[in-house]
């Protein structure tokens, strides 16, 4: 059972609607349909639904996430290894679910993703990814 009530798109107030448009129309939406953001009940998935419950704070969190993900110094594979490492450490199920697929899509080897999940030494010769994983 979810900890927060799922907010349906048709029931959003103006502030929530503005944040919804930012989340689903920004850099995260490139190559994704609106359905990628919505669960089977029609509410936003994962952390996005929580952001909609407090749109002012949600807008700040969204911008920070966008900055780190899309405007940071790490390349895509390095960023995803960092996200997966933190997500696995904290047993963040949604983060793992979402970013394991993204990581594989940006070229992170499936055996490396599995090693992070298993909390095992990283395989292969990906020294930059191993350095990121060790640092995080």
Where are these predicted regions, by residue range?
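Conserved alpha-helical segments that form or flank metal/cofactor-binding pockets of metalloenzymes
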Residues: 57-60, 74, 80, 86-112
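Amphipathic alpha-helical segments within well-ordered protein domains
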Residues: 48-49, 65-66, 83, 100-104, ...
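Alpha-helical ds-nucleic-acid-binding substructure associated with the helix-hairpin-helix region
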Residues: 112-136
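A short structural micro-motif
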Residues: 67-68, 88-89, 119-124
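Aromatic-anchored, charged helix-turn/loop surface patch used as a conserved interaction hotspot
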Residues: 34, 38, 104, 110, ...
């Amino acid at each position: 059972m979810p900890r927060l009530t799922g907010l349906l798109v048709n029931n959003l107030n103006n502030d929530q609607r503005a944040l919804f448009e930012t989340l689903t129309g920004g850099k995260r939406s490139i190559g994704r349909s609106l359905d990628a953001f919505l669960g089977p009940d029609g509410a936003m998935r994962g952390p996005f639904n929580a952001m909609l419950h407090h749109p002012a704070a949600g807008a700040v969190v969204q911008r920070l996430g966008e900055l780190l993900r899309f405007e940071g110094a790490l390349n895509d594979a390095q960023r995803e290894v960092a996200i997966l490492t933190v997500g696995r450490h904290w047993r963040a199920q949604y983060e793992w679910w979402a970013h394991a697929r993204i990581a594989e899509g940006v070229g992170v080897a499936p055996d490396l993703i599995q090693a992070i999940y298993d909390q095992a030494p990283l395989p292969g010769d990906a020294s930059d990814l191993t350095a990121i994983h060790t640092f995080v």
